[in-house]
Amino acid sequence: MGRSLKKGPFIADSLLKKVEKQNSNDDRSVIKTWSRASTILPVMIGHTIAVHNGKSHIPVFITEQMVGHKLGEFAPTRTYKGHIKDKKGAR
């Protein structure tokens, strides 16, 4: 179930302020954020936002196709190292 339309999309206030400040100054430096739950808005297109994955910040360049998705979708939190091929060969 999605979020109610009358509430609007969730975005952290601090993140929105940083994006709007950079838009007014024509600055495109990387913005660090821990807010993985924030929705990507059209105002963010062209910015690089470093999203925290629990260990480090992953830089994510925002494009038009990402609008409406969450920032956390583009910064994976788990690493998959593959299955062990053969336990007998390891001995």
Swiss-Prot record:
Protein S19 forms a complex with S13 that binds strongly to the 16S ribosomal RNA. One of its GO terms (molecular function) is rRNA binding. It comes from Prochlorococcus marinus (strain MIT 9211). Belongs to the universal ribosomal protein uS19 family. This is Small ribosomal subunit protein uS19. The keyword rRNA-binding applies. The keyword Glycoprotein does not apply. One of its GO terms (biological process) is ribosomal small subunit assembly. InterPro entries: Ribosomal_uS19, Ribosomal_uS19_bac-type, Ribosomal_uS19_CS, Ribosomal_uS19_SF. Keywords: Ribonucleoprotein, Ribosomal protein, RNA-binding, rRNA-binding. PROSITE patterns: RIBOSOMAL_S19. GO terms for cellular component: cytoplasm; small ribosomal subunit.
